[in-house]
UniProtKB/Swiss-Prot annotation:
NCBIfam families: PRK14906.1 (NF011498), rpoC_TIGR (TIGR02386)
Family per similarity comment: Belongs to the RNA polymerase beta' chain family.
Protein species of origin: Corynebacterium efficiens (strain DSM 44549 / YS-314 / AJ 12310 / JCM 11189 / NBRC 100395)
Catalytic activity: RNA(n) + a ribonucleoside 5'-triphosphate = RNA(n+1) + diphosphate
UniProt-listed InterPro entries: DNA-dir_RpoC_beta_prime, DNA-dir_RpoC_beta_prime_bact, RNA_pol_asu, RNA_pol_N, RNA_pol_Rpb1_1, RNA_pol_Rpb1_3, RNA_pol_Rpb1_3_sf, RNA_pol_Rpb1_4
Binding site for Mg(2+): D535, D537, D539
Assembly behavior: The RNAP catalytic core consists of 2 alpha, 1 beta, 1 beta' and 1 omega subunit. When a sigma factor is associated with the core the holoenzyme is formed, which can initiate transcription.
Function: DNA-dependent RNA polymerase catalyzes the transcription of DNA into RNA using the four ribonucleoside triphosphates as substrates.
Protein name: DNA-directed RNA polymerase subunit beta'
Length: 1333
């Protein structure tokens, strides 16, 4: 057996008949499977034990040899080898065919490889192979030439004979006619009768003449055909062929069926053909050249690979092992069998019948028919349904052939190799576990016992609770009390992995430390929900157990939930407080006036009535006052603090040297805000403001910003602890805030009718004008839509104004916990305009709110939008999943392979934006809007210098937040950064060009699978976009841009509303041609004018930005007009430019920027942040190849697609050897096409078009170097990414116990004011990644 981990590449090729016979253990001669009485396999049949091995371990078929001691003996009675029955999964047989057959993949695939090789049209091939026409395989030119005069003389003689025969026949007939006429005359017949006889005779003589002529023509045709006879000539006329064979069989050979094809292939000279084709390519033009190119691809493939083309015609076919096409007995005594057995049986039956007929010497026509049937049965076995009607089984179901076993989602590749099931796993419903730490999950006791069974059994024996494993197993099954104690020990320090389907990004599977819980539901930490996109309405999750020490270490260090707080897509925190927690923190940090509840005991300055009130000497004193009920949680007070760091401005003012713990300062704040700051690390600057999740403003602090800042300043462990404290505080205070929703909280607008009456009157006016013909239908529609939108807005504003701040509904919205103001308008104001099935607004709005209830008509109008939202979601979720699959496939081999590729190239990105004062002059600089997604986390490619030329940051510096601020201060508007688009690493990318990992905030590790992370980062929000449409009230919220636009871009398709682009800088001239414009571009450089005709008026001309006349610093937008000056690459119509056009006009960098901007535009419109580097990785894969224009002295074929890095190597080799380099043109490929063009045939075959990819790979004898992830998963090796790359594989360390304890020690969280709340004690945290251990 092969050791699975020892080979480096996997090659696929064409098998010859000898190979097939060599693999085989014997010939299958009979179509029988098993004996119906004994149920034993039949001898020489499809399940024969002599060929495939014994059905029982160490036992021959007749029972003479039993037991392992006879291992390897071949029984002399039944001929079966005594061995394990497992060999029936690996031993192959074969069928010797009585006549050769072609392999359907090579003949029927598109393009037909056989057709290209032999230069035959697929239609003709079909006729030959299926016995519809004859083909000449060889002609003895010399013999024909030397005997030509003799043969010609013979032919002339034959013609003369035919003529002479005809003449004599005609003479006889004339004689007979004379006799007949004489008789008639003697009998006194009338002239009429005599004429009849004469006419009949003349007709007969005419027939004789015509027959002779036909025969002579036929002879002439036979002779002419014979003289011009050439190999590969088809003769469809069977009689003509028979005549040729009868007369001249010594001078040529020919025939029909696969046999003649085989003869042609055997006599085929690859080298000569390749030479000839190259000549045609160099000298020819047009169609001829194109065909030669296509043919050369196939011919050169055989030439290069050393494959024997005869392998495309089979003399023997392999029979796969019987265990892979099993026959199983069902309950009713009937048998179920794999379709392959049926297909093999047909082949064997027809083959045996053909053998018998050949032996009996049956007529050729019968033999040919049987050969055709054999060919069809082999076709059905290899690829059923590829040609003609598929072979069907019972119930008219097409049988599954060998090709069908590989294809599609249910095929071998995707179902069994890439989609394996996993042992040591379980699944259950999830419920919330608010008492858990961030790195913990609650595991049901029963599930844990089953998962950890082997560990528990081992410990039971070790701790001497059980004598042996068997009794330990019994103890576990009976759930003895001591089992639970041992289980506690077994699960400690042993992380488990939780996964929620659909796993859209890498945070869909994370590791947690299990905590045993009662019940049968898994408990999930509330902060982990966002990453899993989980909620507790019946979602289920799967649990997986890492077994080996390495797997456990990996789960704990790389996958622990507390180490995965940041999103790999944008670097923003995902484990954020949400929903109740946000409400709780919002309530905790509110500020109220003394009159309101919670505002009692507020600060009052000293006056004549006494000293100041609401001042506390310490936090403890304030807590005491709160406990007594004197002080409200949200009352503005002054508290002297010494254990919290003051805000930055205050610190600079009070403690110029810097604040130290113990230094006191007076905080003007509320007790709630001090409590919130208690949660944060002690040296984090004090936060004074209301905590909200979204919608900032004065006195409001975004929780996201806080978590972001924490993640940047502190180690992950501190962030995780702080997040947990936030969660506890959030739940604690949201419970105590009493925020609930009841019908009575939805306040109804008292003056709503008055507002609506006003708008009703205006609507009636519009209708009247329309009825009088003063408005067109379109104007009426536009005005009514505008009017009712204003009405909805006015009612909405009025609703917002009547809600007091302490009403729970605005509290939930303002804190950013859930919902938005629009939803409150719908609840309490009015729903407004809705859309009909055509997508137009219905001009009667929904005037009622949900609180009042809709009328029947309004309900009906509303139903369409709601349904469309749900239907769209279902459809687009599937679309998004498919997009993710294609993205993953195209980028799966992009792995960080080296530290630095050493390039000085890069791309320019914006850093600072100018701030203009009232006069339009630059008054300063601010951070550019796109810094988050395009600049942060990169490495400088060149020095960043200011206007004076001073170097602010040297090349190679990381663009951290601090460094970016330096650049903005210096007024540097653009910098050149390293990018994967310009990375010079031949396979994968280098760490410097990639920059920092968004998920860790540190430079990316070598071995990181950045390609897959990129694909997930783009695909995951794709699903989010598609899932989040219906929240915006049905149809109004749909985006056509959305997913279809992203797909269009990544597939590099011509967009739906195509806009041509200017191919040069120049001035435009417009001509109106009715429904179209003709636009002429006059280039500035004086080159030829470019004419764009048939530009649709409906699409409309593009808009351009032009400076205002009186203020050139300001710009206005207007549509293109006569005489406008445009720059290269400007769109000329509204719509989108085609990526191929952009590549042609603006070059590689232009199309890269175009794609990034367009993709980002779609995501930004949805408020989704994705870093540019992820999109860049996909674009790099799309632009990896080029078309060979001139091959120079390289091996490349003109017109073929080659990898640019490969071409670079080949060119440098050619130049070094004094040859000519190849000329290439950059190509942009859609992601599907790029995936299929990948070097790895395993990866391409498992993606799409499996049979086509394998056919191609086999002809080229492709070798898969196993550098991507997919290939290695398929063959069951560790993936070459992460800890699977060789530099991490070949180390062995054994830490001491002390080191292990230090590394895995779990610090406690210390005391907390929420500790005694019945939520349980808190211990546990993540592994501190920052310690070098």
């Amino acid at each position: 057996m092969l050791d699975v981990n020892v080979f480096d590449e996997l090659r696929i090729g064409l098998a010859t008949a000898d190979d097939i016979r060599r693999w085989s253990k014997g010939e299958v001669k009979k179509p029988e499977t098993i004996n119906y009485r004994t149920l034993k396999p039949e001898k020489d049949g499809l399940f024969c034990e002599r060929i495939f091995g014994p059905t029982r371990d160490w036992e021959c078929a007749c029972g003479k040899y039993k037991r392992v001691r006879y291992k390897g003996i071949i029984c002399e009675r039944c001929g079966v080898e005594v061995t394990k029955s497992k060999v029936r999964r690996e031993r192959m047989g074969h069928i010797e065919l009585a006549a050769p057959v072609t392999h359907i993949w090579y003949f029927k695939g598109v393009p037909s490889r056989l057709g290209y090789l032999l230069d035959l049209a697929p239609k003709d091939l079909d006729l030959i192979i299926y016995f519809g026409a004859n083909i000449i395989t060889s002609v003895d030119e010399e013999a024909r030439h030397s005997d030509q005069s003799t043969l010609e003389a013979e032919m002339l003689l034959e013609k003369k004979d035919v003529e002479a025969d005809a003449e004599s026949e005609i003479a006889e007939r004339a004689e007979k006619l004379e006799e007949d006429l004489a008789e008639l005359e003697a009998a006194g017949a009338k002239a009429d009768a005599r004429r009849k006889v004469q006419n009949a005779a003349e007709k007969e003589m005419q027939h004789i003449r015509e027959r002779a002529e036909r025969e002579i023509d036929r002879l002439e045709e036979i002779w002419q055909t014979f003289i011009k006879l050439a190999p590969k000539q088809m003769i469809r006329d069977e009689k003509l062929y028979d005549e040729l064979v009868d007369r001249y069989e010594d001078y040529f050979t020919g025939g029909m069926g696969a046999e003649s094809i085989q003869t042609l292939i055997r006599g085929f000279d690859l080298d000569a053909e390749a030479e000839e084709l190259r000549t045609i390519i160099n000298e020819g033009k047009g169609q001829k050249k194109m065909r030669a190119l296509k043919r050369l691809k196939v011919v050169a493939a055989f030439q290069r690979s050393g494959n024997d083309p005869a392998g495309m015609v089979l003399n023997a076919i392999p029979v796969i092992p019987p265990e892979l096409r099993p026959m199983v007995q069902l309950d009713g005594g009937r048998f179920a069998t794999s379709d392959l057995n049926d297909l093999y049986r047909r082949v064997i039956n027809r083959n045996n019948r053909l053998k018998r007929m050949i032996e009996l010497g049956a007529p050729e026509i019968i033999v040919n028919n049987e050969k055709r049937m054999l060919q069809e049965s082999v076709d059905a076995l290899f690829d059923n349904g590829r040609r003609g009607r598929p072979v069907t089984g019972p119930g008219n179901r097409p049988l599954k052939s060998l090709s069908d076993l590989l294809k599609g989602k249910q095929g071998r590749f995707r179902q069994n190799l890439l989609g394996k099931r996993v042992d040591y796993s379980g699944r259950s419903v999830i419920i919330v576990g608010p008492q858990l730490r961030l790195h913990e999950c609650g595991l049901p006791k029963l599930m844990a016992l089953e998962l950890f069974k082997p560990f528990v059994m081992k410990r039971l024996v070790e701790n001497e609770y059980a004598q042996n494993i068997k009794s330990a197993k019994r103890m576990v099954e009976r759930q003895r009390p001591e089992v639970w104690d041992v289980l506690e020990e077994a699960i400690s320090e042993h992380p488990v992995m939780l996964n929620r389907a659909p796993t859209l990004h890498r945070l869909g599977i994370q590791a947690f430390e299990p905590v045993l819980v009662e019940g049968k539901a898994i408990q999930l930490h509330p902060l982990a929900c966002e990453a899993f996109n989980a909620d507790f309405d019946g979602d289920q999750m799967a649990v997986h157990l890492p077994l080996s020490a390495e797997a456990q270490a990996e789960a704990r260090i790389l996958m622990l939930a507390s180490n995965n707080i940041l999103s790999p897509a944008s670097g923003k925190p995902l484990a954020m407080p949400r929903l109740d927690m946000v409400t709780g923190l919002y309530y905790l940090t509110l500020k109220k006036s003394p009159e309101e509840f919670g505002g009692q005991g507020a600060y009052q300055p000293a006056d004549e009535n006494g000293p100041e009130k609401g001042v506390y000497s310490s936090y403890a004193e304030a807590i005491m006052a709160y406990d007594r009920g004197v002080l409200g949680l949200q009352a503005p007070v002054r508290i002297r603090l010494d254990h919290l760091r003051p805000p930055a401005e205050l610190e600079n003012e009070l403690f110029p040297e810097g604040w130290n713990q113990g230094d006191t300062w007076l905080a003007e704040t509320t007790l709630g805000r001090v409590m919130f700051n208690e949660i944060l690390p002690w040296n984090y600057p004090y936060l004074e403001g209301i905590m909200v999740r979204k919608g900032g403003g004065a006195d409001k602090i975004m929780l996201g910003d806080v978590v972001n800042d924490l993640a940047a300043r502190y180690p992950m462990i501190t962030v995780a602890q702080t997040m947990d404290k936030m969660k506890d505080a959030g739940f604690y205070w949201s419970t105590r805030s009493g925020v609930t929703i009841a019908m009575s909280d939805v306040l109804v607008l008292p003056n709503k009718d008055e507002i609506l009456d006003r708008y009703e009157a205006a609507a009636r006016q519009i209708e009247t004008k329309y009825n009088r013909g003063k408005l067109t239908g379109r104007e009426r529609y536009d005005r009514l839509v505008e009017l009712w939108k204003d009405a909805t807005d006015e009612v909405g504003q009025a609703v917002e104004d009547i809600y007091p701040d302490d009403n729970p509904i605005p509290m939930i919205v303002k804190s950013g916990a859930a919902g938005n103001m629009r939803q409150i308008w719908t609840l309490a104001g009015m729903k407004g305009m809705v859309v009909n099935s055509k997508g137009d607004y219905i001009t009667r709005p929904i005037k009622t709110s949900f609180r009042e209830g809709l009328t029947v008509l309004e309900y009906f109008n509303n139903s369409h939008g709601s349904r469309k939202g749900l239907a769209d979601t279902a459809l687009r979720t599937a679309d998004s999943g498919y997009l993710t699959r294609r993205l993953v496939d195209v980028a799966q081999d992009v792995i960080v392979r080296v530290e630095d590729c050493g390039t000085r190239q890069g791309v320019r990105v914006p850093v600072a934006a100018e701030v203009l004062d009232a006069t339009g002059a630059v008054s300063g600089y601010t951070r550019h809007d796109l810094i988050e997604t395009s600049v942060s986390g990169r490495v400088l490619a060149g020095d960043a210098t200011n206007a004076e030329g001073e170097v602010i940051l040297a090349a190679g510096s990381d663009l951290t937040e601090l460094n970016i601020d330096l650049l903005v201060e210096a007024g540097i508007q653009q910098v050149k950064v390293r990018s994967v688009l310009t990375c010079q690493t031949p396979t994968g990318v280098c760490a410097k060009c990639y920059g920092k990992s968004m998920a860790s905030g540190k430079q990316v590790d070598i071995g990181e699978a950045v390609g897959i992370v990129a694909a997930q980062s783009i695909g995951e929000p794709g699903t989010q976009l598609t899932m989040r449409t219906f929240h915006q009230g049905g149809v109004g919220g749909d985006i056509t841009g959305g997913l279809p636009r992203v797909q269009e871009l990544f597939e590099a398709r011509v967009p739906k509303n195509l806009a041509p682009i200017a191919s040069a800088d120049g001035v435009i001239h417009l001509e109106d041609e009715g429904n179209f414009y003709t636009l002429t571009l006059v280039p500035d450089d004086g080159s030829d004018n470019v004419v764009y005709d048939k530009l649709s008026k409906r699409q409309g001309l593009a808009s351009i930005r032009v400076p205002m006349e009186h203020n050139p610093a300001a710009f206005i937008e207007r549509t293109l007009a006569e005489g406008d000056h445009v720059t290269v690459g400007t769109r000329l119509l509204r719509g989108a430019a085609a990526p191929h056009d952009v590549l042609e006009v603006l070059g590689r960098r232009g199309v890269e920027q175009h794609l990034i901007d367009e993709v980002q535009a779609v995501y930004r419109a949805q408020g989704v942040a994705i870093h540019d580097k992820h999109i860049e990785i996909i674009i790099r894969q799309m632009l990896r190849r080029g078309t060979v224009i001139e091959s120079g002295s390289t091996e490349f074929l003109p017109g073929s697609l080659v990898d640019l890095s490969e071409a670079k190597l080949a060119n440098s080799e050619a130049i070094a050897n004094g040859g000519q380099p190849a000329e290439l043109r950059s190509e942009i490929m859609g992601i599907t096409k790029a995936s299929l063009a990948t070097e790895s045939w395993l990866s391409a075959a498992s993606f799409q078009e499996t049979t086509r990819v394998l056919t191609d790979a086999a002809i080229n004898k492709r070798s898969d170097k196993l550098i991507g992830l997919k290939e290695n998963v398929i063959i069951g090796k560790l993936i070459p990414a992460g800890t699977g790359i060789s530099r991490y594989r070949n180390i062995s360390i054994k830490p001491t116990e002390a080191a292990r304890n230090a590394a895995y020690s779990i610090p406690t969280y210390g005391e907390s004011i929420y500790g005694d709340d019945g939520f349980g004690e808190f211990t546990g945290a993540s592994v501190p990644l920052d310690e070098a251990f």
